[in-house]
Structures are given as C-alpha cells and as structure tokens.
C-alpha cells in the first residue's frame, strides 16, 4: 500500500465501527495533517452517520493543539476537546507535576465522549491554569460534522482507547519539545523559564517515557513535527562577525556614541550540549544548548541562527539557571560536546555592541557587532572597514569546522574540549544517580574556572 493511501478497516475490538490500517512511515506535520483529514473523511463515510472519535496525543509542546485546530478548520462544526480541561484540582498534585495521568478526570471524559457518540448533549469542563482549578462547564450538542477530536498528552491512554476510532501521535524530538514546552508554560501559567525547565527535567520527561511514549506507538498515524519554535520570536539580534584585522579601539570609539559609551571585559566559559541521537560532527545550530558561566552565574541559551546577507540573525531565549540543571539535561539524554573559553572586550553605547572576542580553542580574535537594528549594525561594520569580510558562523560552528577538518585531513584530530566527561559510561552512571551527577558536574566545572 502506498504511504499516502488510506485503507479503512473494521476495528479489531468493535466490528461495527471502523478505523484505518496503520501507516508504516512517520510523517511530517503537513503530510500528517493531510492524511489525518483524509482518514477522518474515509472513516466518517464508512460509518454512515455515526460520530467518529479521533485521539491526538504527544508530549507537551509537540503540536497537538496546532494539528487538531487545523483539522477543525477544514472539517467545520467538529468538536475539539482538550484534556487540559480535565485536570481534577481536588486530587493531590505532587511537586507541581500537572502531567501526572492520575490527575485526569477520565470518568468525566468518558461520560462526555459517550454522550456525544450517543447523540446526546453533554457538559464539558473548563479549567483555568492561572488559578489551578475548574471554573465552569460548557454545554455542547453532538457535532454536526460527526467528528469529535480529543487532544492531550493522554489522549491515547488505555482508559479511553476503546472509544477511539482513529489514533494520531505527534512528537518533535526531545529538543524542540523541550523548547516549545518552556514557551507554552511561560505564556499560559506565568512560570519563569528556568522554573519550567526545572519541572521538565525533573518530572515531565520521566512521565513521558513511562506513561506516554508507549501509547504513541499504537497510533495509526504517527507525525514528527519539525516546526522551528524560534520562528515566531520577536526582537532578534543582528550580528556581524569578522576576524580582527586592524580594527583599533579608536576606530570603535569613533563609531559609537561617545556620550554613552561603556567598556568592560568579560570572561566566559561556554558549555555546549546536543540532544539524544545527535553527533557533534553532524549537528546544527538549532540542536545546541549553550550553558554559559560568567563570574560564577550560569545561564542557558537555546538558539536558532538564520543567515541572511552578511548577517547572522539570532532569535534566542536565554535565562539564568543553577549548575544542577546540567545534570537534568543529561538525564534527558543530552551530551556535552564542547567547552569553549572566551575573553571579550566589550564596547557599547545603548544601541549597538562591538566586542573583541578572543577564543582560546580557536586560537583567534574576532570582531563582533550586535544590535536589534540591522541598519545600525551594518553601518557600524562599514565604518570599521569590515564589509566583504564577514563570517556567517557562530563560534561553535567554527570550532565544529576545525574538528571536522582534522578528521578529514587524517592529521592530529582536534579533540573536543570536554575533559572526557561525556563518555557513555559516565552518562549511564550519572543517569542512575542525579545527585552524584550534579555534584560531579559542579566540581568539574568549578575546577575549570
């Protein structure tokens, strides 16, 4: 059967209802959406007027709501039920873990689904995350389109699986799911980014591996969402970078506003991690997480750099974390791949920043111009005589090139500057004991400072 062909078959558990033959391949978001709509239409046609129930499940931030809403947009007068509204605040919430399946009011959910399948009106609950409680009910009539969609991390759970005619799973890989979950929590619950990240490493992904991932493997349609969560970020930073070639301090002073200019020197210690099933040689900027130590304070940055003309355009999110967060990320399967020392002499006037960046591992000094206004950044580069001499790569990309070149030249291989901390045995041992992991990481990093 072609991967785009939908074959409707009787459900194994209920021969009077229908599903589709599972598709063998995982699908992109767009193809998954297209085939989900085709499958729903085909099952609906075969079901001759019965309400069909579609479950859409996946980890937090994977895109369940997005694909469900797109389906509703092309199948109007369908009903979309979000499992987020079925949290039961009367049940004990342990360590702010709202992803615990025991908090879901499956009895009410099953009643609502059964009512709608039986062409009866039903009262759907409404939940307020900012107040952590159910605040109202909404009466709905059976869907005129005969399509009922259930979306949520436990939408394929065994408690309701017998009610589903079609199962759709969606995931984005640990890295994108992690970032999108942080963005969602900040917007919806008012959490600070570091609080969301801590919760994810401590509770969300352990719950996912144990109680969600097995259900996703049962879906007839499996989607991998490659949506870039950085694409919608506002206020990107425009960066021009060049190898230092005769750019003097006096030249920099002449470019900046003399009345507001400030100068300082900073030393950074940047630790780069990549997600599971990724190698350093084949990784890209959207894969990396950078943990920076500056004067004993750690910050984490997710970055997706876009290249346009001479610019590196860098939408990013960064926030302060504790050193123990490294252990949490490694417990998710992230690996340390590089630790890079950097000394920056920084000149800024409130509008743009110009710096000399000395990279120990690269053995070079660079001039970098940054700002939120592309025109101002470009004009500064022109005045410094850097036009036609720009590099469109981040420092970790330049180091990656050096590493790959040493491999291809069969010369002395450039070793990754990580002190051997991320070998497989160390990672396995660390995963078995997060406390020891956090302590050893902290000691290792502090010894390098």
UniProtKB/Swiss-Prot annotation:
Q: Which organism is it from?
A: Dictyostelium discoideum (Social amoeba)
Which top EC class applies here? transferase
Reactions performed catalytically:
uridine + ATP = UMP + ADP + H(+); cytidine + ATP = CMP + ADP + H(+)
> Which annotated residues bind ATP?
58-65
Which UniProt keywords are listed?
ATP-binding, Kinase, Nucleotide-binding, Transferase
Q: By what name is this protein known?
A: Uridine-cytidine kinase C
Q: Which family does it belong to?
A: Belongs to the uridine kinase family.
Give the pathway: Pyrimidine metabolism; CTP biosynthesis via salvage pathway; CTP from cytidine: step 1/3; Pyrimidine metabolism; UMP biosynthesis via salvage pathway; UMP from uridine: step 1/1
One Gene Ontology MF term: pyrophosphatase activity
The superkingdom listed in its UniProt entry is Eukaryota
What is the organism lineage in this UniProt record?
Eukaryota, Amoebozoa, Evosea, Eumycetozoa, Dictyostelia
Note whether Acetylation occurs among the keywords: no
Enumerate the InterPro entries for this protein. CYTH-like_dom_sf, CYTH_domain, P-loop_NTPase, PRK/URK
